[in-house]
A protein has these predicted regions:
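Active-site entrance/lid segments in N-terminal catalytic domains of soluble metabolic enzymes
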Residues: 2-152
Length: 152
């Protein structure tokens, strides 16, 4: 007799408690299909990071030795990255039958809202909010400090 491993996570019904976390493995449709075949009950799609947009725009701007286009590059790269992420999320959703959870990481409220809306529009079954702060200089930052900053 098989053991029933059904459970729920954040209100999502799962056939077992195994969830593939956001990683390079969960950004490929083929890998996600393989994970599902291997028995994974849900997939957290590779995160979209707002700070990656700023980093890439700054790198391009530095290479061209002009600062004024950085403003425009931020917007262009941001739209391009969001479009690619949405397409990937849509492809994973249409090729997998298990729940697909979108992982988003923003820096400001407007971006959080934009990314969350995009995930919902692409059919994500849930959202993982990736709270982090790459600018922490103090290694003694207390547990929960970063999270409280985002909530406030």
């Amino acid at each position: 007799m098989a053991t029933d491993l059904k459970t729920s996570f954040a209100g999502i019904e799962l056939k077992n408690p195994i969830i593939a976390s956001a990683s390079p493995m969960t950004m490929s449709v083929e890998q996600c299909v393989q994970l599902e075949k291997a028995g994974v009950a849900a997939i957290v799609v590779k995160s979209i990071f707002e700070e990656s947009v700023h980093y890439n725009a700054n790198r391009l701007s530095d290479m061209q030795a002009h600062g004024e286009e950085n403003y425009y590059l931020d917007g262009y790269i941001g739209e391009h990255m969001l479009t690619e992420w949405r397409e990937q999320l849509r492809a994973i959703k249409s090729n997998c039958t298990i729940p697909v959870i979108a992982s988003i990481a923003g820096v400001n409220l407007k971006t959080w809202e934009r990314y969350a809306k995009a995930a919902v529009e692409e059919g994500a079954d849930g959202l993982e909010l990736n709270f982090m702060n790459v600018g922490i200089a103090d290694r003694n930052t207390l547990f929960g400090t970063i999270e409280r900053q985002f909530v406030e």
